[in-house]
């Protein structure tokens, strides 16, 4: 096998056509500024080409079912292995995906419980075993005499196929009737079944009426049914009655509850055989939330307390007002009484209706005539639920979704499974109880299990697989997660490390792994364990390319590839390649300057004093342990702690959602807490994350920041535009008139290639300029609107120097390090760090009220340390304007530059959720219990200090 991966002439995106040789079976870090071309090289070139070559080796029939990747712009790549990408963008949002299912631990748990689980009666709790035919007969004869029933033998249960042979055998055996998917029909004339659908087929063995002398016939029929089905028989009692299921396998003799033979699918909440029928295995139900439709329970009906369409106006003449007036008369309460002081009965009627009982409603016509009619009151919540179910509008559905919240299923209490399945235990715990354990606790639980000789032989290989996967999760720093944790609630870093743990479990060799910042979301304490995992993958014979900015990972790498020197058009060059020491010695490498200590993020000489406080009382969302926390205002504050310590629960679930609800009037349901004091010091809350600034190629930095509106006004004010009668909308590529209609203003056309990836070509009519010829003839300072959109921020600053409002917005984009991006650059091509800085620039360009609360969740994701220095400067600007900045962060270089630190922990999961310490970074370093303080102290000690910009 070739010893190196040799890349020649790589020009993907902004890469400048350089050659690169990468050693195989090494740990290689790609680094450089945000937008320099790291991801273009790692993912868009190496991974894309590795994947493309694999897919092209398949048949054209197979290729149409796989996402075909575009051929990267590169002359050649030799020595390329099959590539596996582990990034942060493919987190599953499926509500059925959990940590257990993603890692396949749940699959092994299902097998374990099906093979060695002990079944119990879900009603009385006693251990249950197989039923005899005599017990079945006695149960049926206990029914009222003259009861009509039919005995059914299930021969197909939830299996796909046409089942022609099975039905032919039924006829040959002399049976006349079958029940197919709930419908009785003649066996000889059974309908053709859909091959791709799951079906249930039951043979009608006997139809009878219960009498005293029927025991012998009943016994014979039961034995026939049991032999046909393999031990299961259904007694169909008739319409309106529930069927009785009997099993030779498992049944409670006391309660008469029977269970089917336990199989792995019985323990799956994604299978109808195991899922709770009420919530379909989701564990939760979507319901209209009273707290979201009544933001303030201290308001009376006369103060219009309902924040929902149709109920927001309760004036006497409105339909809603008439109903509530009738309710107040019937139940004897005043329309001026606050809702939280109304009798429970009256409040229940207002919210949930009169239960069909009519009300006498008085109506006065405009001419003064009075009219009375009777009608039941449906209730605010049932009416809203009905309207949500009936609407066909996506926008209206989204509106009603905002009024709903998830509530635990009342039947399974959030456990997702049927009660009889939850009654099966191993080591005294149900499969749901075992899944609710953290990974660390689960490892201890499975290690403590003991079995008899037979069960021990069955369980041993299953437990070996479970324990191996649990150990891999602990090795990547995820020991605090529970196996039942929904995959959609994981951060990008957590999801990526789960996939990394899964890959370790697969034990593949000879593979090219490409990872995107695996250290994100990981506390410095757990870094060594993660690096050990990466080295293990390398040592068993794989090549690892890691896009990373973490100092520890770079120092542990066999080789570093530094791309730069700048970002966008100023990047895309190979600056340096070699060991960490060689990179440090390279004078052209910005990365080397920071690694060697020649450059660093400075620390303010004097920390800014808080201008006020938010007091969070009794925070207990998720694992928070009823803590009181004071959040400083007017400064740059950071919440720290190991992964799973409760940072996101405090900041995102409690603080941000409460401020959104109370300041921004948003439909949110904050995490559990007693309240937050001090909100009157703020006027709005804004979250600045790394999500794209737009989802389509039409959105760009100019449209997002509001620059494009101003630029269109400039063009509409030119003499040529006025002479032609062009208004501002003429210069929009989103509406008819000025845009090129051949491409609808996109500038590109999508060509569908069927068995190959779709390709995008410039529009032949406008040549990619988006506008028609007439619009492009209007010039300002010799440039058309298309020319302006193609300018960089740096070029536009000089071009629009006569317009202060435009230059102010452009200057903020330049100040946050985005001078290289083009005004019309598609938002889909911006990195997460670039998108975040566009949002920050937009905020900086606004007139500050000094009362804004900014929330940032790990803003350094994807940022080089030089980008982090610029980010800290921008955040300080926001704080120096009187605003408050609250960050969740693990990056020690950012933590040391903050004014105030709130450290949660001490551990993750159940071992976290407490306030370890709070104060300035210097105070945190003095706290012996703080892991953050232990790692922050040496970093703070060697940092240079500067005067604050106040």
What are these regions (language model features)?
Residues 1-950:
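Conserved phosphate-binding elements of NTP-dependent enzyme cores
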């Amino acid at each position: 096998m070739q010893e190196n991966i040799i890349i020649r002439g790589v020009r993907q995106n902004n890469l400048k056509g350089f050659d690169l040789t990468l050693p195989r079976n090494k740990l290689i870090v790609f680094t450089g500024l945000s937008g320099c071309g790291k991801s273009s090289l790692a993912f868009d070139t190496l991974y894309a080409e590795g994947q493309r070559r694999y897919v092209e080796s398949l048949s054209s029939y197979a290729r149409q079912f796989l996402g075909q990747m575009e051929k990267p712009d590169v002359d050649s790549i030799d020595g390329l292995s099959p590539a596996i990408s582990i990034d942060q963008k493919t987190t599953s949002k499926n509500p059925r995906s959990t940590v257990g299912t993603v890692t396949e631990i749940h699959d092994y748990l299902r097998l374990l419980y099906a093979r060695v689980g002990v079944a119990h009666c879900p009603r009385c709790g006693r251990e249950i075993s197989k039923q005899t035919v005599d017990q079945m007969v006695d149960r049926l004869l206990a029914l009222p005499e003259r009861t009509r029933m039919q005995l059914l033998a299930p021969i197909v249960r939830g299996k796909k196929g046409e089942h022609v042979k099975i039905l032919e055998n039924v006829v040959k055996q002399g049976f006349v009737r079958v029940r197919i998917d709930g419908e009785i029909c003649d066996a000889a004339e059974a309908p053709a079944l859909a091959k791709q659908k799951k079906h249930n087929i039951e043979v009608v063995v006997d139809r009878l009426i219960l009498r005293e002398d029927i025991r012998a016939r009943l016994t014979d029929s039961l034995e026939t049914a049991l032999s046909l089905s393999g031990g299961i028989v259904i007694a169909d009692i008739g319409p309106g009655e529930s069927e009785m299921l009997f099993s030779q396998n498992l049944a409670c003799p006391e309660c008469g509850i029977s269970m089917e033979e336990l199989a792995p699918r019985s323990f799956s909440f994604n299978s109808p055989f195991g899922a709770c029928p009420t919530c379909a295995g989701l564990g939760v139900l979507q319901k209209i939330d009273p707290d979201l439709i009544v933001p303030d329970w201290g308001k009376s009906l006369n103060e219009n307390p309902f924040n929902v369409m149709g109920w927001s106006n309760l004036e006497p003449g409105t339909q809603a007002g008439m109903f509530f007036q009738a309710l107040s008369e019937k139940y004897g309460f005043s329309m001026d009484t606050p809702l939280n002081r109304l009798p429970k009965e009256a409040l229940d009627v207002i919210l949930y209706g009169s239960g069909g009982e009519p009300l006498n409603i008085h109506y006065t016509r405009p001419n003064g005539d009075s009219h009375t009619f009777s009608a039941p009151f449906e209730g605010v919540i049932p009416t809203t639920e009905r309207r949500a179910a009936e609407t066909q509008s996506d926008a209206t559905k989204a509106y009603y979704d905002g009024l709903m919240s998830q509530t635990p299923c009342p039947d399974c209490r959030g456990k997702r499974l049927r009660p009889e399945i939850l009654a099966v235990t191993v080591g005294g715990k149900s499969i749901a109880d075992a899944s609710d354990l953290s990974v660390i606790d689960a490892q201890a639980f499975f290690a403590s299990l003991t079995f008899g000789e037979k069960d021990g032989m069955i369980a041993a290989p299953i437990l070996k697989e479970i324990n191996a996967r649990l150990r891999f999760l602990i090795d990547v720093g995820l020991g605090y997660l529970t196996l039942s944790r929904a995959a959609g609630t994981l951060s990008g870093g957590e999801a990526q490390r789960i996939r990394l743990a899964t890959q370790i479990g697969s034990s593949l060799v000879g593979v090219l792994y490409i990872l995107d910042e695996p250290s994100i979301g990981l506390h410095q304490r757990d870094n060594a364990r993660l690096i050990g995992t990466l080295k293990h993958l390398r040592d068993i014979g794989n090549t690892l390319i890691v896009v990373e900015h973490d100092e520890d990972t770079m120092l542990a790498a066999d080789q570093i590839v530094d791309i730069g020197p700048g970002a966008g058009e100023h990047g895309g060059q190979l600056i340096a390649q070699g060991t960490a020491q060689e990179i440090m010695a390279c004078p052209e490498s910005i990365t080397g300057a920071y690694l060697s200590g020649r450059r660093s993020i400075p620390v303010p000489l004097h920390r800014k004093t808080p201008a006020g406080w938010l007091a969070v009382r009794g925070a207990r969302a998720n694992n928070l342990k009823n803590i009181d926390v004071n959040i400083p205002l007017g400064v740059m504050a950071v919440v720290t702690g190991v992964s799973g310590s409760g940072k996101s629960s405090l900041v995102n679930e409690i603080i941000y959602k409460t401020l959104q609800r109370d300041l921004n009037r948003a439909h949110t349901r904050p995490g559990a807490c007693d309240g937050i004091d001090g909100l009157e010091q703020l006027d709005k809350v804004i979250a600045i994350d790394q999500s794209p600034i737009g989802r389509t190629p039409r959105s760009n930095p100019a449209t997002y920041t509001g620059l494009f509106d101003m630029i269109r006004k400039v063009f509409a004010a030119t003499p040529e535009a006025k002479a032609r009668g062009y208004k501002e909308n003429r210069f929009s590529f989103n509406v008819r008139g000025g845009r090129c209609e051949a491409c609808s203003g996109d500038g590109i056309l999508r060509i569908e290639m069927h068995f190959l990836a779709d390709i995008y070509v410039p529009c032949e009519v406008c040549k990619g300029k988006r506008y028609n010829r007439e619009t492009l003839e209007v010039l300002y300072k010799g440039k058309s609107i298309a020319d302006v959109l193609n300018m960089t921020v740096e070029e536009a600053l000089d071009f629009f120097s006569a317009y202060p409002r435009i230059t102010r917005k452009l200057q903020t984009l330049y100040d946050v390090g985005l001078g290289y991006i083009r005004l019309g650059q598609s938002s889909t091509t911006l990195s997460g760090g670039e998108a975040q800085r566009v949002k920050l620039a937009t905020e900086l360009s606004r007139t500050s009220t000094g009362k804004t609360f900014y929330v940032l969740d790990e803003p350094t994701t994807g940022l080089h340390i030089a980008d982090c220095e610029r980010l800290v400067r921008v955040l300080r600007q926001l704080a120096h304007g009187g605003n408050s900045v609250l960050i969740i962060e693990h990056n020690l270089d950012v933590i040391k530059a903050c004014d105030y630190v709130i450290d949660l922990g001490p551990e993750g999961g159940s071992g976290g959720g407490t306030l370890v310490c709070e104060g300035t970074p210097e105070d945190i370093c003095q706290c012996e219990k703080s892991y953050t303080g232990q790692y922050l102290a040496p970093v703070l000690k060697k940092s240079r200090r500067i005067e604050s910009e106040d």
